[in-house]
């Protein structure tokens, strides 16, 4: 029997942002409604995709997404092995906006957890998502699909690590208190940086960000003082003019590394001409990101090989699952037939008689099941149908 899984969804590849916003499912209200509409299913809803996975016909899932203002051209529908293959590609990071990004694996895990909490899973979906999560872990541990920085903030951290190796003894100055500064500090804190100095035009914003990451806050007038204390400067402030020029960096005993990720730039390019200063800008970081993306692309065939192996493993499990269903039905049928044939027999005799009756059928099912998965109707399906009519 063909695998009865289905997937209905939309993603950054098929729908613009405003459509994805309409389709996104809030976990408190909209997600339970979606699972209720599906009966049994798992919903994966992120900023870049909303996908409904279930067993049987995809029509209810399709109707649910259309009811949220999605038009048919934005949807994709996959069934059987193709639905499972898509789930595996998603969990491995191959279908992400940035190939190999790690966040999606946690989102797949969360989707399964929420479906379980609603009582919306069943055996095929459980196995599909459990195997997808295991595959995602293998893809990241056995290939380089998740290696290297592919965001500007992480590329800046990679550059700092390449220069210093250990960040624990460093004083790092961050210019700006916006989203990019926050993202960089998140990465920085995870690597155990020694001292964080946050400088911003509005000192209150600097204080709020510094408190989050255990740093010190300064207003813009204190920038010259901060520069004298820093080993590394990362600039991401919104400013219409340069905040740091050659005149702000008098000669010093140890070199100063500066990474300018602001646009417009915060640091005068002439700073890079100073013998004691090493300046990197967005173009330098973009080259790092592009190189890492090319390296990840080279790992895709390895991940696809893992996916095909996982598909084979799942289909082998599914063959056994179908046989187990048929065996249970056969055993129940055999007990009924034995009781009809020997109404005076006791429980032990009836169980033995039922076993003798069912045994040859069970052996035949086990021999033929694996050869039939995904092809024409299996012997066990015919038996299940016939037994349901007796």
UniProtKB/Swiss-Prot annotation:
GO terms for molecular function: glutamyl-tRNA reductase activity; NADP binding. The record marks 86 as: Important for activity. GO terms for biological process: protoporphyrinogen IX biosynthetic process from glutamate. NADP(+) binds at residues 176-181. Its EC number is 1.2.1.70. The keyword Nuclease does not apply. InterPro entries: 4pyrrol_synth_GluRdtase, 4pyrrol_synth_GluRdtase_N, GluRdtase_CS, GluRdtase_N_sf, NAD(P)-bd_dom_sf, Shikm_DH/Glu-tRNA_Rdtase. It comes from the Bacteria. It catalyses: (S)-4-amino-5-oxopentanoate + tRNA(Glu) + NADP(+) = L-glutamyl-tRNA(Glu) + NADPH + H(+). Disulfide bonds: none annotated. The keyword NADP applies. The active site is at residue 47. Keywords: NADP, Oxidoreductase, Porphyrin biosynthesis. PROSITE patterns: GLUTR. Pathway: Porphyrin-containing compound metabolism; protoporphyrin-IX biosynthesis; 5-aminolevulinate from L-glutamyl-tRNA(Glu): step 1/2. Substrate binds at residues 46-49, 96, 101-103, 107. Possesses an unusual extended V-shaped dimeric structure with each monomer consisting of three distinct domains arranged along a curved 'spinal' alpha-helix. The N-terminal catalytic domain specifically recognizes the glutamate moiety of the substrate. The second domain is the NADPH-binding domain, and the third C-terminal domain is responsible for dimerization. Catalyzes the NADPH-dependent reduction of glutamyl-tRNA(Glu) to glutamate 1-semialdehyde (GSA). Homodimer. HAMAP family: Glu_tRNA_reductase. During catalysis, the active site Cys acts as a nucleophile attacking the alpha-carbonyl group of tRNA-bound glutamate with the formation of a thioester intermediate between enzyme and glutamate, and the concomitant release of tRNA(Glu). The thioester intermediate is finally reduced by direct hydride transfer from NADPH, to form the product GSA. Belongs to the glutamyl-tRNA reductase family. This is Glutamyl-tRNA reductase. It comes from Thermus thermophilus (strain ATCC BAA-163 / DSM 7039 / HB27).
């Amino acid at each position: 029997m063909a695998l009865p899984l289905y997937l209905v969804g939309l993603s950054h590849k098929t729908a613009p942002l405003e459509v994805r916003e309409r389709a996104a499912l809030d976990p408190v209200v909209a997600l339970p409604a979606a699972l209720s509409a599906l009966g049994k299913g798992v919903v994966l809803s992120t900023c870049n995709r909303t996908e409904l996975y279930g067993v049987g016909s995809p029509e209810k899932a399709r109707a649910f997404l259309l009811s949220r203002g999605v038009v048919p051209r934005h949807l994709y529908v996959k069934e059987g092995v193709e639905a499972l293959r898509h789930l595996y590609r998603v969990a491995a990071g191959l279908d992400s906006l940035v190939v190999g990004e790690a966040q999606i694996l946690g989102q797949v895990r969360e989707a399964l957890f929420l479906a379980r909490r609603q009582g919306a899973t069943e055996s095929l979906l459980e196995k599909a998502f459990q195997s997808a999560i295991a595959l995602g872990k293998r893809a990241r541990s056995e290939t380089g699909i998740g290696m290297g920085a592919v965001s500007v903030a992480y590329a800046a951290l990679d550059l700092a690590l390449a220069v210093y190796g250990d960040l624990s003894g460093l004083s790092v100055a961050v210019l700006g208190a916006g989203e990019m500064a926050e993202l960089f500090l998140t990465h920085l804190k995870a690597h155990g940086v020694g001292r964080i100095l946050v400088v911003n035009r509005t000192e209150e914003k600097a204080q709020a960000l510094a408190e989050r990451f255990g740093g010190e806050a300064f207003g813009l007038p204190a920038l010259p003082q901060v520069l004298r204390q820093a080993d590394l400067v990362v600039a991401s402030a919104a400013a219409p003019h340069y905040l740091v020029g050659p005149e702000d960096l008098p000669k010093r005993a140890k070199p100063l590394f500066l990474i300018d990720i602001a646009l417009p730039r915060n640091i005068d390019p002439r700073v890079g001409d100073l013998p004691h200063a090493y300046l990197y800008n967005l173009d330098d970081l973009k080259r790092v990101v592009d190189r890492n993306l090319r390296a990840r692309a080279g790992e895709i065939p390895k991940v696809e090989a893992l996916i095909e192996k996982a598909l084979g493993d799942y289909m082998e499990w599914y063959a056994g699952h179908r046989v187990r269903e048929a065996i249970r039905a056969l055993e129940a049928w055999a007990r009924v037939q034995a009781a009809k044939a020997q109404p005076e027999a006791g429980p032990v005799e009836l169980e033995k008689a039922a076993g003798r009756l069912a045994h040859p059928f069970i052996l035949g099912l086990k021999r033929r099941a694996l050869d039939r998965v995904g092809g024409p109707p299996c012997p066990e399906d015919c038996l299940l149908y016939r037994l349901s009519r007796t």
